UniProtKB/Swiss-Prot annotation:
<protein>
    <recommendedName>
        <fullName>Nucleoside diphosphate kinase</fullName>
        <ecNumber>2.7.4.6</ecNumber>
    </recommendedName>
</protein>
<keyword id="KW-0963">Cytoplasm</keyword>
<dbReference type="GO" id="GO:0005524">
    <property type="term" value="F:ATP binding"/>
</dbReference>
<dbReference type="GO" id="GO:0006183">
    <property type="term" value="P:GTP biosynthetic process"/>
</dbReference>
<dbReference type="GO" id="GO:0006228">
    <property type="term" value="P:UTP biosynthetic process"/>
</dbReference>
<dbReference type="InterPro" id="IPR023005">
    <property type="entry name" value="Nucleoside_diP_kinase_AS"/>
</dbReference>
<keyword id="KW-0460">Magnesium</keyword>
<dbReference type="GO" id="GO:0005737">
    <property type="term" value="C:cytoplasm"/>
</dbReference>
<dbReference type="InterPro" id="IPR036850">
    <property type="entry name" value="NDK-like_dom_sf"/>
</dbReference>
<dbReference type="GO" id="GO:0046872">
    <property type="term" value="F:metal ion binding"/>
</dbReference>
<keyword id="KW-0546">Nucleotide metabolism</keyword>
<keyword id="KW-0597">Phosphoprotein</keyword>
<keyword id="KW-0418">Kinase</keyword>
<feature type="binding site">
    <location>
        <position position="112"/>
    </location>
    <ligand>
        <name>ATP</name>
    </ligand>
</feature>
<dbReference type="GO" id="GO:0006241">
    <property type="term" value="P:CTP biosynthetic process"/>
</dbReference>
<dbReference type="Pfam" id="PF00334">
    <property type="entry name" value="NDK"/>
</dbReference>
<keyword id="KW-0808">Transferase</keyword>
Length: 133
């Protein structure tokens, strides 16, 4: 079974959407294998977003993810990475289709509620960062 990292970002926590987002994941046949609410340190944020370090929005990403608690989840299921990516919808909520988490619930950038790993390599790296091992 494939595993992936899903983060419910601070805007989702503040808006009390944790249960709704988990319900949508489980309704797609995915299982939550690990879950924790945490504050992301600057160091963890910078490592998590390392691929964007040279981009102009890097600082904004780090500030946003460290500004409030997040819910980190190890999610498992058949084709979990693709299932999660489709369920999340487009990165920009204005472009996300109805029926997706961002299309139905997100307000605007950067408040797009969730993060999901984009490849098996990213999933392995991100799960190690957030859950160890």
């Amino acid at each position: 079974m494939e595993q992936t990292l899903v983060l419910i970002k601070g805007d989702g926590v503040r808006r009390r959407l944790i249960g709704e987002i988990i319900r949508r994941l489980e309704n797609k046949g995915l299982a939550i294998r690990d879950l924790k609410m945490m504050r992301v340190s600057r160091e963890l944020a910078e490592e998590h977003y390392a691929e964007h370090r040279e981009k102009p929005f890097f600082g904004e990403l780090v500030e946003f993810i460290t500004s409030a608690p997040v819910v980190a989840m190890r999610v498992e299921g058949e084709g979990a990475i693709g299932v999660v990516r489709n369920l999340m919808g487009a990165t920009d909520p204005a472009k996300a289709a109805p029926g997706t988490i961002r299309g139905d619930l997100a307000l605007s950038m950067p408040d797009n509620l969730v993060h999901g790993s984009d490849s098996p390599q990213s999933a392995a790296r991100e799960l190690r960062l957030f859950f160890g091992g």
